[in-house]
Amino acid sequence: MSTILLNLDFGQPSKKAFGGNAKHQRFVKKRRFLEQKGFLNKKNQPPNKVSKLNSEPPKKGETSRVDGILKILPCPKKKEAAASKRDSERSKDKKAPLSWLTPAPSKKTASVVSKIDLLGEFQSALPKTKSTQKKGSKKKSLKKKIATENSTQAQSKDKGSKKKPLKKNAVPNSTQARSEDKCPTVPQNLPGKMVAIDCEMVGTGPKGRVSSLARCSIVNYNGDVLYDEYVLPPCYIVNYRTRWSGIRKCHMVNATPFKTARSQILKILSGKVVIGHAIHNDYKALQYFHPKSLTRDTSRIPLLNRKADCPENVTLSLKHLTKKLLSRDIQVGNTGHSSVEDAQATMELYKLVEVEWEQHLAQNPPEN
């Protein structure tokens, strides 16, 4: 069996245990002292209510905490008694200024530098003087001046912007007024972008029932020819339809292949307002569909039928409309039609109702 040894000490506890409490008490006293002087929690206190320093300054070796920074306040050895006398006199006089903050002269430069730092920190806790107020007033006056300058600039800009549209809305000259009366309300961009097209077809496929492109003509707004070519269909031609199309076998000798002609035609039509009579047949032969908003079909414009004294719901031929409205004969004889002549007649017919029809389309745009 092992024996158990107990070492017990029944003497009085050592004085070291109370050392920590004494330090803490000194720390609390110093903290209260600094709080009374207003050096702690400086941000929470108003600047005009700084507590007066009534107690003695810190002695040699003591520490003070200013703004959370622990600093040692060195004091000269020779003049401790004189400093204590001065402190007692200042405590009696409540209205005495904080003159003890000015450090006594010493030979060591390090102590002088530390005291100057403390003076700067202590003076920051004092209430603000009139000089700071003057600076603030100067800043306010500058802000007011800047605001007034900005307001005047904004007003001048507004006046300039108001003056400009007056020049645009000025009364036009007599020549301008006459030109506006003569010109219709149609957009001026349309005539340059308007073309009329007409195609002639031949019969391909079983018994020549399939209509294939054999000639295409395109004219501009003034009737000038932009494109007129014979086109060789990709399929064998069964029926030339010479009586209506005017196409003969000799025309196909040097004809342009369909793919090449189609690409050339579509380049001209892209972005243009295309006018035609029963134009859906021409698009079908080209294997192409143009946007409805850029298509004008003279066979489906009721205004032309009304001017020709015909019912609006009846589809009239190009030959009949040209005879009635333009007093001209087209598609005459056994030689067949001319696609150039038909395209020019289509453009002239559309010009008769251009203003009214474009206004109608502007109010009722077609859906693509």
From Swiss-Prot:
Chain intervals for the UniProt region annotation (Disordered): 33-107, 127-187
E.C. numbers? 3.1.-.-
Please provide the record's keywords in A-Z order: Exonuclease, Hydrolase, Nuclease, Nucleus, Ribosome biogenesis
Q: Sorted alphabetically, which Pfam families does this protein's record hold? A: RNase_T
Compositional bias, Basic and acidic residues, is annotated for 77-96
Q: Name one GO biological process term.
A: ribosome biogenesis
Question: What's the main place this protein lives?
Answer: nucleus
Q: What would you give as a GO molecular function for this chain, any one?
A: 3'-5'-RNA exonuclease activity
The UniProt entry, under Gene3D superfamilies, shows: Ribonuclease H-like superfamily/Ribonuclease H
Q: Where in the cell is it found?
A: Nucleus, Nucleolus
Q: A cellular component term (GO) from this record?
A: nucleolus
Q: Does the keyword Hydrolase apply?
A: yes
Compositional bias segments (type: Polar residues): 42-54
Cite the Exonuclease domain residue spans from the record: 194-368
Composition bias, Basic residues: 131-145
- InterPro entries (UniProt xref): Exonuclease_RNaseT/DNA_pol3, ISG20_DEDDh, REXO1/3/4-like, RNaseH-like_sf, RNaseH_sf
What is the stated purpose of this protein?
Answer: 3'-> 5'-exoribonuclease involved in ribosome biogenesis in the processing of the 12S pre-rRNA. Displays a strong specificity for a 3'-end containing a free hydroxyl group.
Q: What is this protein called?
A: Interferon-stimulated 20 kDa exonuclease-like 2
What gene is it encoded by? Isg20l2
